């Protein structure tokens, strides 16, 4: 098994990814659902650029994931936070996250919006088709395809990614 490749992005990189997304949108959207936590910042940037003011959030967990992985099954999502159906019904809704890895989280949110009567489209900065659990399914909009673990600039000062950055070679100025 190959080691996971990491890619550390700057704020300028994120700006370029957002700029790449904007001309792709074929429809106007009435609402946006930002998936916590990864979709908050790119979703906010997109909402500002697109003039979307009806902004909602969704938080999803897969609590039984370890047991399910051992059995090679998919865990059911637990929605920790989700907008009421009345806020989604009949609305063209853009669902935003930072990355489509396995696709479980954004697919769960998209399906729940559809069940509520909304008209969802999915949008991510990075699409990883190599981890995708949903066959040929892919985000409606994405900036880049990757096989790397992406470290966004809002993630670099905390958690496990801090150790990654500490290993980055420093060059004399």
Positions of predicted regions on the chain:
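PRPP-associated nucleotide enzymes
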Residues: 1-173
